Amino acid sequence: MIKIRRLSSVDDHFQAELDQLLSFEVSVDSEIERTVTQILHQIRTHGDRALLELTRQFDNPDIDRIEEIELPRDEWQSALMSLDKVQREALEQAASRIRAYHEKQLAQSWDYVELDGTRLGQKITALDRVGLYVPGGKAAYPSSVLMNAIPARVAGVRELIMVTPTPKGEKNPLVLAAAAICEVDRVFTIGGAQAVAALAYGTTTVPKVDKIVGPGNAYVAAAKRHVFGTVGIDMLAGPSEILVICDGKTNPDWIAMDLFSQAEHDEQAQSILLCPDKAFLDRVADSISRLIDTLPRRDVIRSSLENRGALIHVRDLEEACMIANRIAPEHLELSVDEPEQWVDSIRHAGAIFLGRYTCEALGDYCAGPNHVLPTSGTARFSSPLGVYDFQKRTSLIQVSAAGASRLGETASILAKGEGLDAHARSAESRYQ
């Protein structure tokens, strides 16, 4: 029997218990920080030489020359052609759906002209070059390639550089095939903090990028945190999360599997169910105990559910939505009748999955919306990765002679009030 936490919103100490359940701090490992700082300094100071040494040390001891870290284009094209038909069609279908969704996000430049001829506007420009980090080896995720590369391509990014480690020379054909589908420009077989550093600072072989996106381990996350400001980054993601709001009418086995789908990521992942039906919570608990041993990652799931999972009894669905906003989850399932009527009640969530048939796993792979989502409550102020993350906005201002006179007088008054006489005189010079 798995020991998953049971809470009730009617209990006097519920808020404190909920706070404890949600409390999670990404501890800063001093050894990781020290190692990452050293690696960043090595790459910044010694470039390719350090990159080759670190790649030999951590990933592939058989690499002889720095030129070997770049994969020729025909190798990833070959990986795509070598996939069996079912896998290739699944990747291509997912890519097509992701592309179609993200094309709806594409922003356009705009402007307008005032009566005196003054023109104001906003220019949308794609980033020049983006670096995509993809974990390597057997645990690689081709879906992450699609979710990160396709929005960049839709945005109009000129050059997309992918880095992925190849432990002991092992390459993941699905990842390379995904790179081919997304028309990535260059692929380098490097990983870890050294790959992040190479992308951020540039070396003779690896070009400097404007932004780095993609998931990674603790060393990659620490490196991204350190280089932020030199380059942009997507986000600092915490453990994966799912919150399910259910009215008690869904198959409890479905709900159990939905909770498992996040719990299997790692021991720190969080899976929570909110329901006004106590008997249904009992049935889900039974399903969890019965089904968990059928899964290969059952030990990870068990640890996740026992440490950070919960089945919570609530008064009604309205209260469930209030609690959901308090949690601001990465993924939120509305497994209820007429889920549309509750959407406006949800203010804070990375993604909302409506209805009993809409499992979160579809969003991870092929529904279309991005699976790179804010975690750890940051959905209160953050959004999913999208086309807008690969575009910049530049203000446009053009005033006529009449506009210079009208606006110049206003600017002069305000500038003098701030004690900035040069500002005032600059504005005045256009109309005096």
Curated annotation (Swiss-Prot):
Function: Catalyzes the sequential NAD-dependent oxidations of L-histidinol to L-histidinaldehyde and then to L-histidine.
Organism: Nitrosomonas europaea (strain ATCC 19718 / CIP 103999 / KCTC 2705 / NBRC 14298)
Listed name of the protein: Histidinol dehydrogenase
Keywords from the UniProt entry: Amino-acid biosynthesis, Histidine biosynthesis, Metal-binding, NAD, Oxidoreductase, Zinc
GO cellular component terms given for this protein: cytosol
The reaction(s) this protein catalyses: L-histidinol + 2 NAD(+) + H2O = L-histidine + 2 NADH + 3 H(+)
PANTHER family the UniProt entry points to: HISTIDINE BIOSYNTHESIS TRIFUNCTIONAL PROTEIN (PTHR21256:SF2), HISTIDINOL DEHYDROGENASE HDH (PTHR21256)
HAMAP family: HisD (MF_01024)
